[in-house]
Amino acid sequence: MFLKKTIETSEHAESYYAASGSWQTDYPELEGELSVDVVIIGGGFSGVSTAVELCEKGYKVALVEANRISWGASGRNGGQLIGGMGHNPDSFIRTIGRDGVEAIYQMGDEGVDIVKERIEKYGIDCDLKWGYCEAGLKPRHLRAYKKWAEEDEDIQLLDKSQLGEFINSDLYLGGYYKSNWGHLHPLNLCLGEAKAAENMGARIFEQSTVKKITYGNNPAVYTEKGTIKA
C-alpha cells in the first residue's frame, strides 16, 4: 500500500511548548534495513505510549516519525490531563446505556492514572500541576455539571461564591472542581516518554516519512532510505 504525500515540514511550529521544550530531539533518519517485533508509525502520544508499553513487555520496537517526536497535535494541545466526556451524558445513555457511560468515565480516570504513574516511574519533567476547574456562564452549563457530578463522585460542584476561591472573576454563575485532574506540558511529556522507550531499547527515527507498507506474512514499512521488517 502506497501512502499519500505528507506535508513537507520537519520542525516544530512556533509555540510556547516548543520554545520551552526540555530538549530538541535529534533522532537519526532511518537508513538501511532493520528487523523488529513491532514497528510503530508516528511519534505522537499514541505511537510513543505504545512504544513504552511494548518495551516494558520485552518487545523489540522501532518507531518512525515523518517530522519530530510530538510534532503534531500531541506537542501543541491544551495540556489538560483530564477524563470525562465533555458533553451531557444523557445523549450517550440513550445509545450505550448507563453502564457504557460509567465505563467511559472509568477509562478516562484510568488514563489519567497511567500518565501519572508513567511520569513518576520515568522521572518525566513536564510541569504537572494537579487541580482542574471549569466555570459556567449559563444555567445550562450548571445543569450539565450537575449531571456530570452524578456520574463522577470526585466532582465538587461550586456555586458563585465558592468559585471565587479558584478564579478572580465574577462573570460566572458557578462551576466544578476536580482535584485528581490537572495540567501539564504535553510536548515535554511526549519527549520524556520517547526517552523512556529509547532507554528500554526502542529504535526511534525522525525525518523518516513512510512511503509504503506491505502486509501478510512479511510485513514491512518503507521510507525513502530504509526498510523495517516486523
Regions found by a protein language model. Name each.
Residues 1-38, 56:
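Extreme N-terminal leader/targeting segments of oxidoreductases
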Residues 33-63:
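N-terminal Rossmann-like FAD-binding beta1-loop-alpha1 element of flavoenzymes
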Residues 53-54, 152, 197:
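Hydrophobic alpha-helical packing residues
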Residues 84-162:
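Dinucleotide-binding Rossmann-like beta1-alpha1 core, especially the glycine-rich loop
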Residues 143, 171-230:
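Helical element adjacent to the flavin cofactor pocket in flavoenzyme catalytic cores
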